[in-house]
Amino acid sequence: MFQYKKYFDEYCEGNKLSLSLSYTMPCGYETAFGTFDSNSLTVFINKNLLKDKEEFEQAFYLFHELRHALQYTNPQLFNNIINESLSYIIMYDGTCYKKVGDKYYKYKINGDEEFLKNLYISQSYEMNVNEFAYKKVCEVMGFSKELEYLYHRWIPKSRILNETYRLIYKEIDKSIKEYYYQVRWWVGFSL
């Protein structure tokens, strides 16, 4: 099995990060290979889901999540497009979240499965972490055709333009503002 803790510690030390590593997935992420929670500064790795995978794949998902941690904790290291997108999470099923402070607000995008998957993997911060994870695993374990195949599974078939994301972000923001206007109206009305 891949030595998660060893590479986690090395990455954190090399990037001056103070993070936690957990193998217990948070609620709602039980079927994910990993996630990073920017509120608790915790990298979650689903060892149970990854236990039968090759070591290069286990490493890929650890480095993927560690790169997310660096994006959130050191945004000055990344370009404006990545930084703009960090407040928005678009999942492969069209479920979206906007982070405001330490809270997440939910939104849903409708579309066919292929479009939504492409929308998810085309996000600037996702493309950045997947490219980083691929290069880091090549550096640590060497190149393999299987690793290259894994990486290409996470490359969008057709890249979605950043302007499209900006329009989606505006729609998410608008929906959140409308929701809070209605809540404030309802609370004021019921008093």
Locations of regions flagged by a protein language model:
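Metalloprotease/metallohydrolase-associated module, dominated by Zn2+-dependent proteases
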Residues: 84-175
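A hydrophobic membrane-anchoring alpha-helix module
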Residues: 167-191
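Zn2+-dependent metallopeptidase catalytic core
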Residues: 1-16
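A structural signal for well-ordered alpha-helical segments within the folded catalytic domains
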Residues: 2, 56-60, 64, 123, ...
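Catalytic Zn2+-binding segment of zinc metalloproteases
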Residues: 65-84
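Short, flexible loop/turn elements at secondary-structure junctions
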Residues: 25, 47-49, 67
